[in-house]
C-alpha cells in the first residue's frame, strides 16, 4: 500500500523516482565539499574548464554594451543562456571528444542545419513543444556552476539590491580578463557569435567559423593565459594573513606528476594515496 510523506513522519527508505546527478540526500559528500572548497578556492568538481571564466567575463561585457535594458537581469540571463548553448554546439561540432563542456549532451542530440538558440535556451521556451531546454537551472550553467567561482576569484560582482544593481557586473580584474579573452578571438568570430546569440539562431555550417572560442585551447604566451595562471597562484583570500592552499595544492599535484609521470593512470587516486602515505610517515 503506498503512503504519502504527509502520513509518515519517521525516516524511511523509498523507491528512487528518477535519476538525477548532483543529489546528496544523506549529505555524504559534505565533508569532501568542505575540504576542496578550502584547499582549492575558485575550483570545484564541476568547473572543469578554466576558460569558462574568461568566456563569462567577455559575454557579460558584450551583453552590457549591446543591449538597451542595461539593468535587467532577465535580459542578461536570456543572452548568457543562449551564449552557453552556442558554446556547447560549437564545441560538439568542432572538437569531438572534448570533455568538461556543459550542455554538450543536449547539443549533440539537437544539431541541425538551422539551430534555434532561442528555443533551446530561452526560459520562456520550456513549455513549448520540442526537445526542451539545454539546462534546467534558470540562471544557466553560470548560475549553477560558475557564479560562486568567479566571485571567489574576484572577477564578477553579484547583483546587489542595496545599491540598485540588478545584474552581474565585472570587477576591474574581470574587465581585464574580458579584454584578454577578446584579444584571442578574431573580430569576425566575435561578431558572428554575438549576432547569433542576439538573433537566437545560427546555421550549423557557421559553427566551424567559431573555433577560437574553444574551451580547451588557451594560446600560449597570451595575456589571457597569464591571468589564469596568476589567479590560480594568488592568495586564496584578502585577509590580513592570507592562505595559499590552492597554490600549494597545485604545486603538490605538479610535483606528483613530475615524479610519477609514466605510472599515473588515475591521477586523483594516485595523488591522494601518495600524500596519505607521506602524511603517515610524518606522523610516525
Predicted feature residues:
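Non-catalytic recognition/regulatory regions in large multidomain proteins
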Residues: 1-284
Amino acid at each position: 500500500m503506498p503512503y504519502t510523506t504527509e502520513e509518515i513522519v519517521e525516516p524511511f527508505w523509498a523507491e528512487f523516482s528518477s535519476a538525477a546527478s548532483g543529489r546528496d540526500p544523506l549529505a555524504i559528500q559534505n565533508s569532501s565539499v568542505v575540504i576542496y572548497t578550502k584547499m582549492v578556492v575558485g575550483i570545484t568538481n564541476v568547473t572543469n574548464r578554466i576558460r569558462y571564466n574568461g568566456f563569462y567575463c567577455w559575454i557579460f561585457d558584450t551583453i552590457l554594451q549591446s543591449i538597451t535594458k542595461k539593468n535587467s537581469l532577465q535580459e542578461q540571463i536570456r543572452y548568457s543562456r543562449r551564449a552557453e548553448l552556442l558554446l556547447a554546439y560549437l564545441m560538439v561540432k568542432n572538437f569531438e571528444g572534448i570533455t568538461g563542456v556543459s550542455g554538450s549532451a543536449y547539443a549533440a542530440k539537437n544539431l541541425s542545419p538551422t539551430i534555434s538558440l532561442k528555443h533551446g535556451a530561452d526560459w520562456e521556451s520550456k513549455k513549448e513543444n520540442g526537445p526542451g531546454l539545454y539546462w534546467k537551472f534558470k540562471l544557466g550553467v553560470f548560475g549553477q556552476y560558475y557564479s560562486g567561482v568567479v566571485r571567489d576569484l574576484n572577477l564578477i560582482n553579484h547583483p546587489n539590491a542595496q545599491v540598485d544593481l540588478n545584474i552581474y557586473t565585472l570587477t576591474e580584474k574581470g574587465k581585464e580578463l574580458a579584454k584578454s579573452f577578446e584579444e584571442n578571438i578574431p573580430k569576425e568570430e566575435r561578431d558572428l557569435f554575438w549576432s547569433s546569440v542576439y538573433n537566437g539562431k545560427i546555421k550549423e555550417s557557421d559553427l566551424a567559423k567559431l573555433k577560437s572560442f574553444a574551451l580547451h585551447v588557451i594560446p600560449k604566451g597570451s595575456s589571457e593565459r597569464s591571468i589564469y595562471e596568476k589567479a590560480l597562484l594568488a592568495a586564496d583570500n584578502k585577509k590580513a594573513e592570507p592562505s595559499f592552499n590552492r597554490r600549494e595544492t597545485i604545486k603538490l599535484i605538479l610535483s606528483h606528476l613530475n615524479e610519477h609521470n609514466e605510472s599515473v593512470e588515475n591521477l586523483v587516486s594516485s595523488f591522494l594515496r601518495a600524500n596519505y602515505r607521506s602524511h603517515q610517515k610524518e606522523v610516525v
